[in-house]
Structure formats: C-alpha cells, structure tokens
Amino acid sequence: MIKIGSHVRFRKPDYLFGAIQESLENKANAAMIFLGPPQSTFRVKPENYKFQDYQKHFFKQIPPEDIIVHAPYIINPASPIKAQFSNDFLVKEIEKINYIGAKFLVLHPGFFTSFTKEVAKKQLISSLKSILEKTKNVILLLETMSGKGSEMCANFEEIVEIVEAVESPRIGVCLDTCHVWDAGYDLKNFPEFCKELRKTRLINYLKVIHLNDSLSPLGSKKDRHANIGKGFIGLETLRKIVFDPLFANIPKILETPYVDNKPIYDQEIALLLKKV
C-alpha cells in the first residue's frame, strides 16, 4: 500500500482535527505534524488537541499510526551540555504522542559543535537509551542529515551504528531524500542507491521517508528543499521511491516549500501518484 502525505499545520483552534482535515483535502492518507512551533518547545495541553473530533470524523481515513510527529529543531540530544534538557523534553513529548496514539517521533540527531564527534555519538546513544527507558510505545526515528556544519548522521554507516548501539525495537530511521542527496548519495542511480541501503543495513530500520527534491547539486551539504520535480533529484526518481516495492507501506511525507505563501501538497501528491 502506498502511504503518502505531508507536513500539515497543527495550530489553534483545531489542532489535530484541523491538521488531519487539511491532509485529507490534499488527498493524503498519512500526515506529519509538530506538536508546537518547530523552533520552540512551547506546547499546549493534549486536551486542546480536539482528539475526540478527529476520532469521530477522520480516524478511519488516517489512523493514528499514520500520523508522524516531528520533534522541534532546537533540541540537541548529542550535546553533553544540552542533553538533559533535550531528553526531559522528549520524554514529555512522547507522553503527548501516546495521547494521540501516533507511532513515530522523528528527530534530528544533533550537532557535535564544540565537542568531538565521538563524544557526541556516545552522548546521543546514551540520550536515546535514557529516553526509551522512561517511555513506552513510540518509536524514535533518527533523520538522515545533509552533513551541513557539524551535523550527526550524514552517512548511512554512522546512523546504523548508532541505531544498533541503542539495542531497542523502538529505534529506527527516517530517510530524507533531499538530505541524503545533499550528503552525496546519488538517488538518480536508483539501483545502486537501493543496493547501498541494503549493504549498510539501513533498509532494516527504515520506517518513514521525507520525500523532498533538492535545490542543490549532489553532495553540496546545503539542505535546501525544492518542490517535487523542481530540483536536482527530479520527479522521475522521487516517483520511483513512491512506487518501488522496497518502500511499500513506508509513509512518504512531503516537506516542500510553499508557493505564493501557500502549500501545494495536493498538487505534488497528485503528481507523484500519477503513473506514466
């Protein structure tokens, strides 16, 4: 089954109910939300989510397991200085996600900034273990990154090493097509790309895909998303990811730019699903 959707706005007054309504208007059957502003840890109480309205009207069309939650960008579980704050926040975030019944929490692995990469890697593994020990149900997904600055997890071997070191069925990977392209993985050589996923074992942990085109050439380490078919990856390659059996039942989530201050996810989803 093809599961496809986009990032949708989780905001007052309708929160979850409004977000899933927007997804359905885009002809999607999956969705991704932030539980608050992406650059902030501010959160409203779960009783404001309008979960009962969602449950009554939209539960069957987009069930909770196909609602992906993204952690805010400002946390850094790989930093020995910021880890405690990040970990405490993520434990509370998972409690809110369990209220919804969503299955996956995507998070950026963090930066090693003023620390060595090895120190940051050990801290990240420790953080993930601690968060999982204090929570239940939700699966943490480390997102593949572009390699910009001191970002962690810009190559498949590193992200798999971290996932396997955590030793939990509640840890996995979210692959971002723009990020891996910018990190130097040539998706346009599709057979070789799929071979690399198998070789590094990343495919064993892949739970969600962020489906984005890239404004930048291969290996640029820029992380600038483009609309579907308007970047260097191209529609043909992104459509292969939608339809290839290797990625069956994995939710594909668009995070592409707005056009004239409006999302065009409905058009992009239709474009991707169009068989040629």
Swiss-Prot record:
One of its GO terms (molecular function) is DNA binding. PROSITE patterns: AP_NUCLEASE_F2_1, AP_NUCLEASE_F2_2, AP_NUCLEASE_F2_3, AP_NUCLEASE_F2_4. Zn(2+) 2 binds at E143, D176, H210, E255. One of its GO terms (biological process) is base-excision repair. The keyword NADP does not apply. The keyword Hydrolase applies. Binds 3 Zn(2+) ions. Zn(2+) 3 binds at H179, D223, H225. Keywords: DNA damage, DNA repair, Endonuclease, Hydrolase, Metal-binding, Nuclease, Zinc. Zn(2+) 1 binds at H70, H108, E143. Its cofactor is Zn(2+). It catalyses: Endonucleolytic cleavage to 5'-phosphooligonucleotide end-products. CDD domains: AP2Ec. Endonuclease IV plays a role in DNA repair. It cleaves phosphodiester bonds at apurinic or apyrimidinic (AP) sites, generating a 3'-hydroxyl group and a 5'-terminal sugar phosphate. Belongs to the AP endonuclease 2 family. NCBIfam families: nfo, PRK01060.1-1. HAMAP family: Nfo. This is Probable endonuclease 4.
